[in-house]
Each structure stands twice: as C-alpha cells, then as structure tokens.
Swiss-Prot record:
Record-linked SUPFAM superfamilies: Ubiquitin-like (SSF54236)
Modified residues (Phosphoserine): 90
Domain of life from the UniProt record: Eukaryota
Any matching Pfam family: ubiquitin
Name the record gives this protein: Ubiquitin-like protein 4A
BP term (GO), one: post-translational protein targeting to endoplasmic reticulum membrane
Crosslink (Glycyl lysine isopeptide (Lys-Gly) (interchain with G-Cter in ubiquitin)) position: 48
Compartment list: Cytoplasm, Cytosol; Nucleus
Modification after translation, per record: Polyubiquitinated. Ubiquitination by AMFR and deubiquitination by USP13 may regulate the interaction between the BAG6/BAT complex and SGTA and therefore may regulate client proteins fate.
Region (Required and sufficient for interaction with BAG6): 96-138
Record keywords, A-Z: Cytoplasm, Isopeptide bond, Nucleus, Phosphoprotein, Transport, Ubl conjugation
Record's keyword annotation contains Glycoprotein: no
Protein role: As part of a cytosolic protein quality control complex, the BAG6/BAT3 complex, maintains misfolded and hydrophobic patches-containing proteins in a soluble state and participates in their proper delivery to the endoplasmic reticulum or alternatively can promote their sorting to the proteasome where they undergo degradation. The BAG6/BAT3 complex is involved in the post-translational delivery of tail-anchored/type II transmembrane proteins to the endoplasmic reticulum membrane.
Species whose genome carries this gene: Plecturocebus moloch (Dusky titi monkey)
Amino acid sequence: MQLTVKALQGRECSLQVPEDELVSTLKQLVSEKLNVPVRQQRLLFKGKALADGKRLSDYSIGPNSKLNLVVKPLEKVLLEEGAGRRLADSPPTQVWQLISKVLARHFSAADASRVLEQLQRDYQRSLSRLTLDDIERLASRFLHPEVTETMEKGFSK
C-alpha cells in the first residue's frame, strides 16, 4: 500500500509498504528517504503516536493514509536514552548501525531491517537468559584463557 509521511517542517515522502509492516521498519524506510535518524522520529496517525513494536494494521492504517512525522531534537533523545537505558540493555548504537550497513549491502532495505530487528530481539533474549553461572564461566574464559585452553585440550584426547 502507498503511504505519505509528512514532516512538520514541510518535507514529505511516499512509501510503498505492506499493510502488516512493523512501525519500526517504516521508521527505517523514512530514515532512508528523509534522512532523519530513527531514534529522532515520532510517527503519528490521526494524532496518535505509533509504537515501534506494533504493525500498521494495528492502527487501521490503510492505503493512501497520511502519517505525520515529528522530529525530536537530538538533545532530548539523548536525555531520554540516558535516563531510560541500563548499561547492559543493548550494545552501543554504533554497533547496530555498523551491522545495519553490512546487512544493507546484502539485502533489500526491508529485508535488512527485518534481519536487524531479529538480531536485536535475539540479543535481548540471550542477555535476559544469562545466569550467574554463565557470567562466571565467561569471566573465567576472559580472565584465564590458558586454563580454558588446557581444559579443552584435555577433553579432546
């Protein structure tokens, strides 16, 4: 379906997306078209803010709909992220941006966005499942790699 995204500053773009597309994927496409970083975007439909994890169909957004884009000032975004982010929540944004660039070389924009979203979900799930034993094992491997190598050689005989 065809959508129009209009920024309050007057710029706008038309996008072709499936009706069940994720809002986060739409934001990625808007970022590419209007050169507005995803984290500074706030998309509105009929005055209601759209949540990244929801699909366009969840808001009854149909063909030829018009969405409004509010561009949040970078300072405000950084303050929000700093206040709401725990240290282990996610790797630095630069890591995700680098992964996104690599994916963009090998996939279409929509596919790259979906792969990146899945990687981020898998990363969060893996972190949330770490036990204290897992963390101790990882720490031992980093702090004492020679012991780990010796143990692995002993098992392979």
